[in-house]
Amino acid sequence: MVNQQTLTLRGMGCAACAGRIEALIQALPGVQECSVNFGAEQAQVCYDPALTQVAAIQAAIEAAGYHAFPLQDPWDNEVEAQERHRRARSQRQLAQRVWVSGLIASLLVIGSLPMMLGISIPGIPMWLHHPGLQLGLTLPVLWAGRSFFINAWKAFRQNTATMDTLVAVGTGAAFLYSLAVTLFPQWLTRQGLPPDVYYEAIAVIIALLLLGRSLEERAKGQTSAAIRQLIGLQAKTARVLRQGQELTLPITEVQVEDWVRVRPGEKVPVDGEVIDGRSTVDESMVTGESLPVQKQVGDEVIGATLNKTGSLTIRATRVGRETFLAQIVQLVQQAQASKAPIQRLADQVTGWFVPAVIAIAILTFVLWFNWIGNVTLALITAVGVLIIACPCALGLATPTSIMVGTGKGAEYGILIKSAESLELAQTIQTVILDKTGTLTQGQPSVTDFLAIGDRDQQQTLLGWAASLENYSEHPLAEAIVRYGEAQGITLSTVTDFEAIPGSGVQGQVEGIWLQIGTQRWLGELGIETSALQNQWEDWEAAGKTVVGVAADGHLQAILSIADQLKPSSVAVVRSLQRLGLQVVMLTGDNRRTADAIAQAVGITQVLAEVRPDQKAAQVAQLQSRGQVVAMVGDGINDAPALAQADVGIAIGTGTDVAIAASDITLISGDLQGIVTAIQLSRATMTNIRQNLFFAFIYNVAGIPIAAGILYPLLGWLLSPMLAGAAMAFSSVSVVTNALRLRQFQPR
C-alpha cells in the first residue's frame, strides 16, 4: 500500500534548497517517490505507511532548517484567512526591510561619492564617509538581510550550499575586509593592502536582493490566482427547504438529499438534480461553455453555476469536497504541484551550480591577485561572481509557467492532470477522434425501420427488438428502445441475453431466438442478408449505422440509426489540421458508414469496424510508427485507449471511467477544447523555453563578466552593486514572463 501526501514548504530560498529537500526525503526509508516544486512551495511524497509516517518526513525537513506541514484545505475559510494573513504579514515585513536597507544604502552611497569620485561635492560632508560611521550604518542593513546568513549557516551545517551561501560568502567577505580596514587600517597598509571599505556596496547589494525577493514573492502569489478564483465561485449560502420552511444556511451545512431552492440570478450552491421548475443556467464559469443550458426536471446542475431565468428546486446530490467544483480545484492543485520533465534539466544544473560558483569565485580571486597583485580588484571580482550567480531563475523557470498554464486551462474548462500532460500535449502529431459522443452528439436515434412482412409483423418485430435491446447499455440499444416505446410497443421478458462487444446482442424473446447486430456478425452466424442488401447499403452511404434483426436464423428487419454531428466538429477538425496534426476517426461502424461521416467532417484517415477491445491496439499501432498520439473519447470502452495514448483527452460529458483514464478532461464536452489545450500547451512550453533561455544566458554571460573577462579589453569591471541588481531582477523577470501566460487566448 502506498500513500500520497502533499506538504507545504516554507523557508526555501532558491532551487538548490528544493533539490536538497527532495534528496533528503528520497533518502528516507519507505519513501518511494518525491517531487519538490520550488515555485509552488510544495512537496508531493509517495510513501509506504508501514515504513514511515508523515510526521517523520516533516521532522527530517525541519531538521534541515526548513518548515513543512500538510497542505491546508483551500475550502476552509478560517485556514484560508490565516494563510492570507501570513502571506500579507510576510510581505509587509519584507517590504519594511527593503525600505530600511534601501534608505540606509542610499545614505551610504551619497556619503561615499566624494571618495569614489575623488572630488569634494558641496552639501556632502566628508565625515559621512568615515569608516566607523559607515560600519554603524551597515549593521542595521545586515540585520535586515539576516535571513541570507541564517539560511547559509543552516546549509553549511547540512554540508550543502544554496543561493544564500553565495550571498552570505560574498557580502561576508567584503564586510570582514572592510571591518579589518576600519579597526586596523595602519596594519593593513604596512601589509601592502589598500585601506578601502565596501560598506556601501554591501548595503546596496542586500537592499537590492531584498527588493528582488519581495517582488518575486508578490509575483509568485499571483501564479496561484486560478485556485483562489475557482474557490471564489462557490456560493456562500443556500436556501434549504426543511420541514416546510425555507432556511438560509451556510453552504457548509447543506447535506446530501436536501432540497434547495435557487432563484433567478442566484448561484446554484451545490451539485444536484432538478426536481421542480425550468430555467436556463450559465455554466461558463465552470465548463467554459458560453451559451446558457436549458434545465428541467430530471436534469443535473453543477454547483457554482448561475441560474438565469426561472426558479429551480434541486435535490442535493454532492456537497462539500465531493462537488464538481471541489474536484476541479483538487485536480488543478495536483497539476500545479507536479513537475514537468523539462524541469529535470534545470534540476540537474542547480544540483552542482552553487559549489561550481564558489569554486569559480575562489579561482577568480587567485588569478587576479597573482596576475596584478591587487587585492581590491581580486575581491571585487570574486564578490561579483558570488553575487551575480542566480540559481533561483533556473528554479522558477518551469514551475511558475506550469502553475499559470494549468490555471489558465481551468478557466477554459480544460482540466490538465499533471505538468507532464501539459508538456506532452505540445508534441502531439496525431489526434484520434472516437466517433460516437466525440464527433457526434452521443444521442443516436432511429431514423428508419424496414421489416419483411405486414404492419402487424413489423410491430411484433419492433417489440421483440426493443425488448432485447432493453437489456443492453449501448447507446444504439437505447435509441432502439426509445423508438419502440414511441411506437407504442410493450416490452417483453428476455432470457439467455448475451452482448457481443462490437457486434450485437442475442437472446430469447417469447420463445424466439433473436439476434440484432452488424452485417458482418450476422454473416458470421450464417444469416443471409441479401434480401435487404440494397437498402442496407443506401443507408450506410448516407452515414447511418445499420443493424439487422434476425429471428430464428433469418433476417426479418433492418434499422438505421443516426447520431447528429456536434456543431463544432467540422471547425475543430480544420483547426487541428491547420495546427499540422494528422486527424484520424475511429469507429465500430462499417467502412461505408464511417467514410460518409468522415467525409462530412473533413477527415481522410478512418479506422472503421474497430471493436471496443481493439481500440487500444489501434493506438499502439500508430505509436509503433513513431507517432505521438492523442486519443479523444468519452465512453467506458474508450478508457484502455485513453490510457494507451501518449495524451488521453476525455470529453467531460462522458463516463467517470474515461475521465479517470485521461490526462486532460474537457469539462463542457466542446471539442474546441482539444484545439485550446494544444495551443495552451505550446504557449506554455514556449514560455518555459524562454524562461530557461533567459536564466541560462543570464548566468552563462553574467558570471564571466563579473569575473572581469572584459577588463583586459575595455578596462571595465562590473561593480558588485550592479551584480546584485542583476541577480535580484533575473528571478523577477522570469516570473513576470511566466505571468504573461495569463493573457493567453485561443485562436
UniProtKB/Swiss-Prot annotation:
Q: Which UniProt keywords apply?
A: ATP-binding, Cell membrane, Copper, Copper transport, Ion transport, Magnesium, Membrane, Metal-binding, Nucleotide-binding, Phosphoprotein, Translocase, Transmembrane, Transmembrane helix, Transport
Could you tell me which PANTHER family the record lists for this protein?
ATP7, ISOFORM B, P-TYPE CU(+) TRANSPORTER
Q: Which organism is it from?
A: Synechococcus elongatus (strain ATCC 33912 / PCC 7942 / FACHB-805)
EC numbers listed for it are 7.2.2.8
Q: Which gene encodes it?
A: pacS
Q: Does the keyword Cell membrane apply?
A: yes
Grouped into one coarse class, the protein's main location is membrane
GO terms under biological process: copper ion homeostasis
The name on file for this protein is Probable copper-transporting ATPase PacS
Where is it found, in Gene Ontology cellular component terms?
plasma membrane
Q: Which residues cross the membrane?
A: 102-122, 133-151, 159-179, 200-220, 349-371, 379-396, 689-708, 721-739
Q: Where does Mg(2+) bind?
A: D634, D638
